[in-house]
């Protein structure tokens, strides 16, 4: 399929710069795959579409304030470092993006805060990419504590604003557990603890997996032929208890609802020949685009995504290309909010 098929005009005013006051008060478009029916609801109405013994699968990856501002040794020039991925746990070796890249060279030392963190540039990986070694003698947990104090929430440029205090809480799901992601699962941002409890009381099984989302969800795809697109690998874990819960739902012909395209990516990475979920841990660069035969998920919660973005392609693979493009035109007409802090869609 061609990338240009996913191009549409999105008014910039529909890109939400801030979240709604209450997570579950975002709007929810419900799209019925089989009939093409479209309903306009509020996110808390999700409870009406999930029943007893249905399963809701969450991505519990936790982001951290991964954007650091510092200075170069000797010159004192101001620099910016975006921590992308920890390369060796406990060794404080990181894959990063830096600005201004042309001034940050191998051998440079970079200082953050009042010298609480010092890093040495070990390698150039891309035009903006650098491998940094943080000269830090503490534990991994102590390192993250300092980063939490010095770092800023890495909001996407499309929001056109600097991070604010509320982003520390709102740019994170209420169920985040495992630190390592640089982007949160957008669809999960709509869940409040209250809504999750209501779902549990209704008999919905809520079960986690972990996929540490990288920058793929922020990027606009840069090749026309989607079969030639190469995405970075992301670390994931599907625990045994989630496998049992999901497979039981499939055996009982109950819904398996994935929260976010990162969740369907993890689930579809680890499917047996018989169409059942398997425990898995490792890295995935699975690319999902139309047409695609989903083996595990029966419904999907996702946000409204930017044109020519990977999450949009994933959503179209699940909901059907024509129906998704129709739904997006309706969303624009009805002034739904897009992107990270935008509204949600339930595809059933």
Swiss-Prot record:
An annotated GO cellular component: cytoplasm
Primary location: cytoplasm
InterPro entries: QueA, QueA_dom1, QueA_dom2, QueA_sf
Location in the cell: Cytoplasm
Taxonomic superkingdom: Bacteria
Short name of one Pfam family: Queuosine_synth
UniProt-recorded Gene Ontology molecular function terms: S-adenosylmethionine:tRNA ribosyltransferase-isomerase activity
EC number: 2.4.99.17
Catalysed reactions listed for this entry: 7-aminomethyl-7-carbaguanosine(34) in tRNA + S-adenosyl-L-methionine = epoxyqueuosine(34) in tRNA + adenine + L-methionine + 2 H(+)
Biological process, per Gene Ontology: queuosine biosynthetic process; tRNA wobble guanine modification
Pathway entry: tRNA modification; tRNA-queuosine biosynthesis
Keywords: Cytoplasm, Queuosine biosynthesis, S-adenosyl-L-methionine, Transferase
EC class name: transferase
Assembly: Monomer.
Functional note: Transfers and isomerizes the ribose moiety from AdoMet to the 7-aminomethyl group of 7-deazaguanine (preQ1-tRNA) to give epoxyqueuosine (oQ-tRNA).
HAMAP family from the UniProt entry: QueA (MF_00113)
Family named by the database record: Belongs to the QueA family.
Protein name: S-adenosylmethionine:tRNA ribosyltransferase-isomerase
Gene: queA
